[in-house]
């Protein structure tokens, strides 16, 4: 019977025998791709290399998704297998199906040290449904595949906020453990989640305002933050909530992205948690590519907000430097444009000086990489939206499924 590592309520790869075993490994290779099917950013694939290298004496079958139905990047995983081969220095074979007879035969023929990547899991319709683990265990995917394996490893923290069959279904029918990346994410984020030192400061920006407004609500509800520093589109929503006239072009952006309902939610949060949510004092407008800094009550109607201003940068930086815990998610401005990366750069430098620093989100990590700040952060999360969901204390079905398996198998 497996035994949990002390202090953990799930099993890790150290807790089970993996040598020459048949391993089903859920990874997240979902990456930005160009129109020709080339992968533009290899960080997702690189993040799983530690796990793959530790399984060199096993027979490994990987599952991943790419894009969503209807998206331009909703495509096969052939390019991912080729890139994984290059990065790993070992052959990763691509199988253009998931659980057909052909795919199952390919799995059965694997020898020790072989690695196979199955087709995009979202090509299977039921993968796109969020259901309870016991329901997912009855899907064709799980029923066809699970008899071919000895162990299921979930290394895909970044999709573990979803209750999809490739994430939770196999935990009902196979010995199930966390991969190295998964374990690192949970351990690193837990230090932030369970931090009882103050102040705890969150700098939250980017364009996904609806997601972040919910996260702000959840974090404040559980008393997890002393300050929330708003930037990006998130800040625009909160500025509108306190009656600031953000200008026609910025208001239209909020309307077009269906974020107007978030303004009323933001207004309620500002009243309920007075003094905890901080809104910019000044911003930088994009005036034909040039940076035009103005106070928030002087925003011009025809110019888009592209960054926070110098006074806000100074105030926010002070909060972050003095924090016992800092969490940075989402850029403060349009980091891709040189004129509007100042806010993101300065806040990232400040956050790195806090006692325990966490950063996540694709654009944020890219900025940290460009600034050479990787070694300055306590934990860099590859989890994207899942990392901020985890820090808000929200339910994570993929992780809960691993914990439930450990609870069942490790009973006295």
From Swiss-Prot:
GO biological processes: gluconeogenesis; glycolytic process
SUPFAM superfamilies the record matches: Phosphoglycerate kinase
Entry binding sites for substrate: 28-30, 65-68, 122, 162
Catalytic activity: (2R)-3-phosphoglycerate + ATP = (2R)-3-phospho-glyceroyl phosphate + ADP
Annotated keywords: ATP-binding, Cytoplasm, Glycolysis, Kinase, Nucleotide-binding, Transferase
UniProt GO cellular component terms: cytosol
Record localization: Cytoplasm
UniProt-recorded Gene Ontology molecular function terms: ADP binding; ATP binding; phosphoglycerate kinase activity
Organism, scientific name: Methanosarcina acetivorans (strain ATCC 35395 / DSM 2834 / JCM 12185 / C2A)
Class of the enzyme per the UniProt entry, highest EC level: transferase
EC identifiers of the protein: 2.7.2.3
InterPro entries attached to this UniProt entry: Phosphoglycerate_kinase, Phosphoglycerate_kinase_N, Phosphoglycerate_kinase_sf
Name of this protein: Phosphoglycerate kinase 1
Pathway as given in its UniProt record: Carbohydrate degradation; glycolysis; pyruvate from D-glyceraldehyde 3-phosphate: step 2/5
Domain of life (superkingdom): Archaea
Pfam families named among the record's database cross-references: PGK (PF00162)
């Amino acid at each position: 019977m497996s035994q949990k590592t002390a202090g953990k309520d799930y099993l890790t790869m150290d807790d089970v025998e993996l040598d020459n075993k048949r391993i089903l490994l859920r990874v997240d290779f979902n990456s930005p791709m160009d129109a020709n099917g080339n992968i533009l950013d290899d960080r997702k694939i690189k993040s799983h290399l530690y796990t793959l290298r530790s399984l060199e004496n096993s027979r490994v079958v990987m599952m991943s998704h790419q894009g969503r139905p209807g998206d331009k990047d909703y495509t096969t995983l052939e390019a991912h297998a080729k890139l994984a081969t290059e990065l790993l220095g070992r052959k990763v074979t691509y199988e253009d199906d998931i659980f057909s007879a052909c795919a199952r035969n390919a799995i059965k023929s694997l020898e020790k040290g072989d690695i196979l990547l199955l087709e995009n899991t979202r090509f299977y319709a039921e993968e796109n449904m969020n259901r309870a683990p016991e329901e997912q265990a009855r899907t064709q995917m799980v029923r066809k595949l699970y008899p071919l394996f000895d162990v299921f490893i979930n290394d895909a923290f970044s999709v573990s906020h979803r209750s999809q069959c490739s994430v939770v279904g196999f935990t009902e029918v196979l010995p199930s453990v966390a991969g190295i990346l998964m374990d690192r994410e949970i351990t690193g984020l837990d230090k932030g989640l369970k931090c009882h030192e103050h102040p705890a400061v969150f700098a939250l920006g980017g364009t996904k305002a609806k997601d972040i407004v919910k996260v702000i609500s959840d974090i404040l509800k559980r008393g997890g933050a002393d300050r929330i520093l708003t930037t990006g589109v998130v800040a625009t929503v909160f500025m509108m909530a306190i009656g600031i006239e953000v200008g026609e072009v910025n208001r239209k952006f909020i309307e077009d992205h269906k974020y107007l309902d978030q303004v009323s939610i933001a207004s309620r949060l500002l009243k309920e948690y007075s003094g905890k949510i901080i809104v910019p004092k000044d911003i930088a407008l994009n005036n034909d590519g040039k940076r035009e800094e103005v106070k928030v009550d002087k925003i011009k109607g025809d110019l888009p907000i592209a960054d926070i201003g110098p006074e806000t940068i100074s105030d926010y930086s002070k909060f972050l430097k003095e924090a016992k815990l800092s969490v940075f998610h989402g850029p403060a401005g349009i980091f891709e444009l040189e004129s509007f990366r100042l806010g993101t750069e300065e806040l990232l430098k400040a956050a790195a000086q806090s006692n325990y620093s966490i950063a996540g989100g694709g654009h944020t990590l890219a900025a940290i990489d460009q600034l050479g700040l990787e070694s300055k952060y306590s934990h860099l999360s590859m989890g994207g939206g899942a990392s901020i969901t985890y820090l808000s204390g929200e339910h994570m079905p993929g992780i809960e499924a691993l914990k439930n398996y450990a609870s069942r198998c490790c009973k006295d």
